[in-house]
Amino acid sequence: MSEEFKLPKRSRKRTREVKRKARPELDGENAWSAMRYCEKFEPFWDFTDNLERIEESQVPESEFIERFERPYKPVVIRGCTDGWLALEKWTLARLAKKYRNQKFKCGEDNEGYSVKMKMKYYVEYMQSTRDDSPLYIFDSSFGEHHRRRKLLDDYVVPKYFRDDLFQYCGENRRPPYRWFVMGPARSGTGIHIDPLGTSAWNTLIRGHKRWCLFPTQTPKELLKVTSAMGGKQRDEAITWFSTIYPRTQLPSWPEQYRPIEVLQGAGETVFVPGGWWHVVLNMDDTIAITQNFSSQTNFPCVWHKTVRGRPKLSRKWLRVLRDQRPELAQIADSINLNESTGFASDSSSNSSSSSSSSSSSSEEEESDDGGDSNTDSGQESLTAKKKKKRRMAGGGSGSGSMGGSSRS
């Protein structure tokens, strides 16, 4: 019997509606669980974590910049959550009670608009689902809602990541940058690079996340799942770990593109430098907060990509920087936009998994729309980008526009 039939009637009805809108291509009775990953998920735990850990209390900001941020080196940070109210408040039971009738984004429809679900229904779905790649909350608008914004009181930005240069664009114009993310085992984020050269941090409050990270020079064709391999689930994290990951463990896989692997536990924060490919699979029920950022350290790359990908936004940004941060405006003026940044982009103009390497052409490398996101660290999915591109080509506008504010 499908897990949907185990849900209360109203939850079952709402879950079906959300699924129909978010993934209309999965239209068969058993399409959501055709691969039966729920029954064969145990082997996905079998890997070796190989990423360095540091303690926030033992590494000052200046040392973090020199050891990790400036050389674009991933790391796991412990101790960032000390004193966070989220440790106590962010449980399934408490979230289902406090935010029971609040709607959170868990997908997008074919027009690129948000598909939302009430928290009470989503928690019931989480606790019963046997879907191969379940619905996943990835809400960037929670901070704009008078009730959901209370989540902001439950955490603080870790000390290494408080340099927030996109704030000078204005809260209504800046690209989406923070997400409340929550999902069951087998949900997750397909392989991607975060937008506009931004770096990201992801702090896990509950559960475990499995990460694979690859340096920016890794050719896209090595990492992307083809239609032949993944079918209708080609963009899903569990599909990537089933099809591409085994190849990364073969002797024939290029040594310079070996993955960094992480099992992130509750209380740990993963730092993802700009330009790094990464894929994330939830191993059990997870709740996390993640933010993308531009700092003084990564500003040259972020500025370069923003000018190329979001020219109107860059002009507004530069006007404010000239007034409030003239030293950064001077850096912006000195950057040669005709030179490559050396960092790849998960380009919306070339989303085919069989396409050429992301570093093979300057035009592809620098194409990045920086739109709304639905992942663990801020990059928009290829599926969402294609939907949005179709809508814009047809003259659509409104809440799905790419003006930097999130859809709600």
Swiss-Prot record:
<keyword id="KW-0223">Dioxygenase</keyword>
<dbReference type="GO" id="GO:0048512">
    <property type="term" value="P:circadian behavior"/>
</dbReference>
<feature type="compositionally biased region" description="Gly residues">
    <location>
        <begin position="393"/>
        <end position="408"/>
    </location>
</feature>
<feature type="binding site">
    <location>
        <position position="209"/>
    </location>
    <ligand>
        <name>substrate</name>
    </ligand>
</feature>
<dbReference type="GO" id="GO:0106140">
    <property type="term" value="F:P-TEFb complex binding"/>
</dbReference>
<dbReference type="GO" id="GO:0005737">
    <property type="term" value="C:cytoplasm"/>
</dbReference>
<feature type="binding site">
    <location>
        <position position="278"/>
    </location>
    <ligand>
        <name>Fe cation</name>
    </ligand>
</feature>
<comment type="similarity">
    <text>Belongs to the JMJD6 family.</text>
</comment>
<dbReference type="GO" id="GO:0046872">
    <property type="term" value="F:metal ion binding"/>
</dbReference>
<dbReference type="GO" id="GO:0033749">
    <property type="term" value="F:histone H4R3 demethylase activity"/>
</dbReference>
<feature type="compositionally biased region" description="Low complexity">
    <location>
        <begin position="345"/>
        <end position="361"/>
    </location>
</feature>
<dbReference type="GO" id="GO:0005654">
    <property type="term" value="C:nucleoplasm"/>
</dbReference>
<keyword id="KW-0805">Transcription regulation</keyword>
<dbReference type="GO" id="GO:0005730">
    <property type="term" value="C:nucleolus"/>
</dbReference>
<keyword id="KW-0156">Chromatin regulator</keyword>
<keyword id="KW-0804">Transcription</keyword>
<dbReference type="GO" id="GO:0018395">
    <property type="term" value="P:peptidyl-lysine hydroxylation to 5-hydroxy-L-lysine"/>
</dbReference>
<protein>
    <recommendedName>
        <fullName>Bifunctional arginine demethylase and lysyl-hydroxylase JMJD6</fullName>
        <ecNumber>1.14.11.-</ecNumber>
    </recommendedName>
</protein>
<dbReference type="GO" id="GO:0070815">
    <property type="term" value="F:peptidyl-lysine 5-dioxygenase activity"/>
</dbReference>
<feature type="domain" description="JmjC">
    <location>
        <begin position="146"/>
        <end position="310"/>
    </location>
</feature>
<dbReference type="InterPro" id="IPR050910">
    <property type="entry name" value="JMJD6_ArgDemeth/LysHydrox"/>
</dbReference>
<dbReference type="InterPro" id="IPR003347">
    <property type="entry name" value="JmjC_dom"/>
</dbReference>
<feature type="binding site">
    <location>
        <position position="202"/>
    </location>
    <ligand>
        <name>2-oxoglutarate</name>
    </ligand>
</feature>
<keyword id="KW-0053">Apoptosis</keyword>
<feature type="binding site">
    <location>
        <position position="194"/>
    </location>
    <ligand>
        <name>Fe cation</name>
    </ligand>
</feature>
<dbReference type="GO" id="GO:0005634">
    <property type="term" value="C:nucleus"/>
</dbReference>
<dbReference type="GO" id="GO:0035212">
    <property type="term" value="P:cell competition in a multicellular organism"/>
</dbReference>
<feature type="binding site">
    <location>
        <position position="192"/>
    </location>
    <ligand>
        <name>Fe cation</name>
    </ligand>
</feature>
<keyword id="KW-0408">Iron</keyword>
<comment type="function">
    <text>Dioxygenase that can both act as a histone arginine demethylase and a lysyl-hydroxylase. Negative regulator of apoptosis; functions upstream of hid possibly by acting on the JNK signaling pathway. Not required for apoptotic cell clearance by macrophages in the developing embryo. May be involved in regulation of chromatin structure, promoting expansion of euchromatin. May be involved in regulation of behavior and circadian rhythms.</text>
</comment>
<feature type="binding site">
    <location>
        <position position="189"/>
    </location>
    <ligand>
        <name>substrate</name>
    </ligand>
</feature>
<feature type="region of interest" description="Disordered">
    <location>
        <begin position="342"/>
        <end position="408"/>
    </location>
</feature>
<dbReference type="GO" id="GO:0033746">
    <property type="term" value="F:histone H3R2 demethylase activity"/>
</dbReference>
<feature type="region of interest" description="Disordered">
    <location>
        <begin position="1"/>
        <end position="25"/>
    </location>
</feature>
<keyword id="KW-0560">Oxidoreductase</keyword>
<keyword id="KW-0539">Nucleus</keyword>
<dbReference type="GO" id="GO:0046329">
    <property type="term" value="P:negative regulation of JNK cascade"/>
</dbReference>
<feature type="compositionally biased region" description="Basic residues">
    <location>
        <begin position="8"/>
        <end position="22"/>
    </location>
</feature>
<dbReference type="GO" id="GO:0043066">
    <property type="term" value="P:negative regulation of apoptotic process"/>
</dbReference>
<keyword id="KW-0479">Metal-binding</keyword>
<dbReference type="Pfam" id="PF02373">
    <property type="entry name" value="JmjC"/>
</dbReference>
<feature type="binding site">
    <location>
        <position position="290"/>
    </location>
    <ligand>
        <name>2-oxoglutarate</name>
    </ligand>
</feature>
